[in-house]
């Protein structure tokens, strides 16, 4: 290699370059981290530097496998379990319908409620007269 020309000149006006400080050698924490990474690399435990797309694809594959296992478990359900699920769904539907009816009745205008009360009292009077 060729010698730099600033070594030959003894010009005091020039600023001579100084050797840069190596951060690995100066910091104890950095040295420990570097040593640990080298040991892990030798053992084959290096952190996986996979691209983001590859990580997403692996996650999707795992999710698909889990989903397939759940579906297979559902397919293996007995007739009793299937019937119980159907009944539970019917009960939930009935409860929802009752709630909707109650909400409709509560939200109905006052004159509709009064009309219903008058109709009921009229029917009760008619039944009382017949008996």
UniProtKB/Swiss-Prot annotation:
Which InterPro entries does its entry note?
FAM107
Comp. bias regions, Basic and acidic residues: 52-79
At what positions is N-acetylalanine found? Answer: 2
The disulfides recorded in the entry are: none
Query: Coiled-coil intervals in this record?
Result: 61-112
Q: Tell me yes or no: is Coiled coil among this UniProt entry's keywords.
A: yes
Asked if the record carries the keyword Nucleotide-binding, the reply is: no
Task: Write out the tissue specificity statement of the associated record.
Answer: Expressed in the hippocampus and hypothalamus. Expressed in the pontine nuclei and reticulotegmental nucleus. Expressed in Purkinje cell and nuclear layers of the cerebelum. Expressed in the choroid plexus. Expressed in hippocampal granule neurons of the dente gyrus.
Induction or repression? Is not up-regulated in the hippocampus by acute social defeat stress or glucocorticoids stimulation.
Stretch list, region Disordered: 39-79
Q: Which residues carry this modification: N6-acetyllysine?
A: 50
GO annotation terms (biological process) = sensory perception of sound
Q: Name the keywords, alphabetized.
A: Acetylation, Coiled coil
What PANTHER family does the database record attribute to this sequence? DOWN REGULATED IN RENAL CARCINOMA 1/TU3A, PROTEIN FAM107B
The family this protein is said to belong to? Belongs to the FAM107 family.
Q: What is this protein called?
A: Protein FAM107B
């Amino acid at each position: 290699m060729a010698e730099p020309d600033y070594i030959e000149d003894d010009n005091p006006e020039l600023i001579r370059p100084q050797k840069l400080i190596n951060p690995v050698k100066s910091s104890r924490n950095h040295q420990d981290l570097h040593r640990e990474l080298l040991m892990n690399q030798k053992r084959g435990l290096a952190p996986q530097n996979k691209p983001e797309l590859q990580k997403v694809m692996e996650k999707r594959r795992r999710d698909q496998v889990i989903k397939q296992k759940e579906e297979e478990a559902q397919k293996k359900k007995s007739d009793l379990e299937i019937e119980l699920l159907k009944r539970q769904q019917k009960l939930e539907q009935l409860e929802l319908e009752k709630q909707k009816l109650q909400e409709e009745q509560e939200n109905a205008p006052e004159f509709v409620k009064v009309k219903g009360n008058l109709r009921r009292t009229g029917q009760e009077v008619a039944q009382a007269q017949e008996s």
